[in-house]
Amino acid sequence: MLVLFVLSLVVSCALCQTFQYSRGWTNGKRSNFPAEISALGYDRFTNGELKRLKMLIYGSADEQPLLIHCDFVDKLKKFAHTDNAEPDQLRREKAPNNDNY
């Protein structure tokens, strides 16, 4: 019984290794996309956006270019710096708790 188990283990290892080195298993390699498909993705991004995406994927010590400019934050800062706005206006007031759950 043990001989049969060892023999089947050896045969399965040999078959798996043969399959791995055949065309069935690429071992992490990826096939190349056709040029017309890969070119479509680059048209969607501007040069700066593509550079930021590459920095995000590959990692970079300088995180400043990855920060996204947000108009809402600028408007909020302008609102907070006006004379009419006080910092308490930006906070939400607590509703009275009537113990109604």
From Swiss-Prot:
Its main location: secreted. It comes from the Eukaryota. Keywords: Amidation, Neuropeptide, Secreted, Signal. GO terms for biological process: neuropeptide signaling pathway; positive regulation of heart contraction. The modification Asparagine amide is found at residue 27. Expressed in central brain and the retrocerebral complex but not in antennal lobes, optic lobes or in gnathal, thoracic and abdominal ganglia (at protein level). GO terms for cellular component: extracellular region. Belongs to the corazonin family. This is Pro-corazonin.
